[in-house]
Amino acid sequence: MASIHADVTLVGGGIMSATLAMLIHRLDPALHICMIEQLPDIALESSGALNNAGTGHAGYCELNYTPHDKDGNVLIQRALEINAAFEVSLQFWSHLVNADRENITPSSFINRVPHLSAVWGQKDIDFLKARYTLLKSHHLFSEMKWSEDEQTLADWMPLMMKGRQAEPKLAATRVEHGADVNFGALTRILVSYLQKNANFELLTNTRVVDLHRAHGAKKPWAVKVKNQNSAAKQTIESPFVFLGAGGVALHLLQNSGIEEAAGYGGFPVSGQWLICQNQDLIRQHHAKVYSLAAVGAPPMSVPHLDTRIINGKPSLLFGPYAGFTTKFLKHGSPFDLAKSVRPHNLKSLIGAGKNNFDLTKYLVKEVFQTHSQRMQSLEAFIPNARAEDWQLAHAGKRVQIIKRCHHKWGKLEFGTEIVAAEDGSLAALLGASPGASVSVKTMLDVLERCFPQQMQSAEWQDKLKTMIPSYGRSLINDANLSASVRRYTLDTLKLSS
């Protein structure tokens, strides 16, 4: 069996691995990076344009990022954190555009699409107004607008207001400089750039079949791979491995045997979209409009009506409709969930299952929805919606985190988490939303945990501050810094109105 060496091995050909590869390459071009993807091409799973919402998640419109506390107060800290993290992504993307203007055009992966939150009924309007008041007072959200005026709302979202009854009353907030991001296109841009360098290697149609320490603790990792076309096998020896393979990252993390993986499990959730086939309707809507999830629904099923810009062409999607699945990837196996059950996480899985039985029941019910039932959900957004204008399509899978919880055996978490070996030689990304939008901040966290000495060096610090001007400072606490950074990114990425 052939054996090769790589300083950095990345499992998965999506936005996370591509972002980490680009960061590492910019920080130390001499490092040899190997990316492994089991499908014929990169960005075919969750990073693919129709496999995710494409929302530049900035906390502007996603109401699940501003929950109530037990006393009914609206909490905005999570929205502030996500907004600041998205600003980090915008800075890095701006740096890449400025560094390679001949080959990277902002509109090829990011476009301005206003972000709106819309609710109906007095109770939900009161919640949205309280949310707006708190967010508007913070400099990161100072440009947010509010309206209950019918004409203003018709200007903001004409398709949604057409044919709408006066009751229930509707209200909305709007941020003009919201973004739609094609993470599949961005992934391909990053990898295309990396492939021009001799120290980067991409292996497609290649599956990881084993992962272990080459010669025991403190030694490089041995990543055994198999080409799915030729059946040829080889071993990649690498001092650092990143597992960014979506839901399958959990399987690989478990196979690594690191102590930190104990207790972790996964709860897969499927997704479906209704995609508009009527160009006249598509032209009438230019926004991402989010509302509140139904009672008992998971956060990733918050309904939204989205303008998408895919390959330069506007599209209109509604959803997602969440459902129960046992697959961890869109191209995965029905046995993915079963294969993830281990003695060390059995208690976590039982606890999470017991405490989330209503959620499981909800997801199973969603799977069996008819087209007419899905259309009923859409009609809350578009009163005159016609079934013949919309076609069902499958989105990517989301594997939510299950982990140990002393009080409940196990708990289900919505979000992302980095699980890393104590010595920093291996890291895995688990979970889902906000995911791709905060990929740069997340991958910087990986570098800080796994390359601590290099990240503190003057050389890397200087490079990081060139790529990300706010690095090491707080956009949440520094209004002047935030304003400066936002002017720079909105101008560079052509997101200003």
UniProtKB/Swiss-Prot annotation:
InterPro entries: FAD/NAD-bd_sf (IPR036188), MQO (IPR006231). SUPFAM superfamilies: FAD/NAD(P)-binding domain. Pfam families: Mqo. Its cofactor is FAD. GO terms for biological process: tricarboxylic acid cycle. Pathway: Carbohydrate metabolism; tricarboxylic acid cycle; oxaloacetate from (S)-malate (quinone route): step 1/1. The keyword Plastid does not apply. The keyword RNA-binding does not apply. It is an enzyme of class 1 (oxidoreductase). GO terms for molecular function: 2-hydroxyglutarate dehydrogenase activity; L-malate dehydrogenase (quinone) activity. Its EC number is 1.1.5.4. It catalyses: (S)-malate + a quinone = a quinol + oxaloacetate. Keywords: FAD, Flavoprotein, Oxidoreductase, Tricarboxylic acid cycle. NCBIfam families: mal_quin_oxido (TIGR01320), PRK05257.1-1 (NF003603), PRK05257.2-1 (NF003606), PRK05257.3-2 (NF003611), PRK05257.3-4 (NF003613), PRK13339.1 (NF009875). PANTHER family: L-2-HYDROXYGLUTARATE DEHYDROGENASE, MITOCHONDRIAL (PTHR43104:SF2). Belongs to the MQO family. This is Probable malate:quinone oxidoreductase. It comes from Tolumonas auensis (strain DSM 9187 / NBRC 110442 / TA 4). The gene is mqo.
